[in-house]
């Protein structure tokens, strides 16, 4: 699974 964290 790919985890994308951008706020």
Swiss-Prot record:
A molecular function (GO) term: enzyme inhibitor activity
UniProt entry keywords in alphabetical sequence: Copper, Metalloenzyme inhibitor
Task of the protein: Binds one copper ion per molecule but does not bind the galactose oxidase apoenzyme. It may inactivate the enzyme by binding to its prosthetic copper group.
Listed name of the protein: Galactose oxidase inhibitor
């Amino acid at each position: 699974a790919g985890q994308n964290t951008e706020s």
